[in-house]
Amino acid sequence: TDIEVTEVLATDLLDAFERTPRLATVVLWAASRDEAMVVEHLVDVGRRAATERTAHFLLELGARLALVGMGSKVGYACPLSQYLLADALGLSAVHVNRVLRQLREAGMVTFRDGFVAFDDYDRLTDFAEFDPTYMDQMTPLLK
């Protein structure tokens, strides 16, 4: 995709915010959404056990893909290997394999042949304490 990039001076941006307060609101709202995602990822690494962290990550990927019409509460295509999942989660590939088996045997999610299937979406979201509102893209930025 072609894009065009330009440098914007901070003073020019602040002037634009002063002239158009609604623009400032939109930019700050978008930044707060990004910050909420970063905070959620820090909680993942610092406070969640490997099983909950993996479940949360798979749910978040699904929610992000749903925003662009590529995922649902049924599941989604996921070409990531267990090695890539391990890197993203800060776990070993062997540990990810064990965790995925535990989640599958518990009847919550199956990760097989490049597809994540949510076998019991509601139970999985409860287990992972997943609340997708931190990624909310449906609420209008301006009313």
For each predicted feature, which ranges?
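Phosphate-/nucleic-acid-contacting segments
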Residues: 63-143
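Alpha-helix N-cap/helix-start capping motif
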Residues: 10-11, 21, 48, 121
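Polybasic "coupling" helices that flank or enter modular domains
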Residues: 18-90
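Short, flexible helix/strand-to-coil boundary loops that buttress conserved ligand/catalytic motifs
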Residues: 9, 17-20, 128
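Ligand-binding loop in jelly-roll beta-barrel domains
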Residues: 1-11
